[in-house]
Regions:
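Membrane-interface interhelical connector segments
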Residues: 2-3, 40-54
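Extended, low-polarity transmembrane helix blocks
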Residues: 1-37, 58-66, 70-136
Length: 136
């Protein structure tokens, strides 16, 4: 069994970067999608439904869009700047998703709704890139 495990590990090492890259692309595309749906600015839905100031609602939309773009582009920047951009985008995603869970979904805390929703996966994926950066 140990030998079989080593063979699988040796084979899959060739694809290790693909695991992080695929998670990064899905996360980035999701945030680009969610952010772009809030245009034109200010997003009237956020302003009216959550009673947000237009500047704050616009900041949310731009933060989502830019986080998605940056998390993808930073994968191809192979120097400390790429690592910093990845961590900043990850941190921004964590802050956005934490705020969204508190403001928009406060009834979800520690229920099946939370753990069966995309929001928790976006939050944890952002946390992954905040901690990991561009490091292997």
């Amino acid at each position: 069994m140990n030998n079989f495990d080593k063979k699988i590990d040796n084979y899959l090492q060739n694809f290790e970067a693909l695991a992080s890259l695929s998670l990064r692309f899905i996360l980035g595309i999701a945030f680009i999608f969610y952010g772009s749906r809030k245009f034109p600015l200010p997003p009237e839905g956020l302003v009216e439904y959550y009673d947000l100031h237009p500047i704050l609602a616009s900041t949310v939309a731009l933060s989502e869009l830019l986080s998605g773009i940056i998390i993808i582009i930073a994968a191809f920047i192979k120097n400390p700047l790429g690592n910093i951009l990845t961590r900043l985008a990850g941190l921004n995603i964590v802050l956005l998703m934490s705020s969204i869970l508190v403001v928009a979904h406060s009834d979800w805390f520690i229920t099946t709704k939370l753990f069966s929703s995309v929001q928790i996966f976006l939050l944890v994926s952002g946390l992954f890139f905040f901690i990991k950066g561009n490091n292997k």
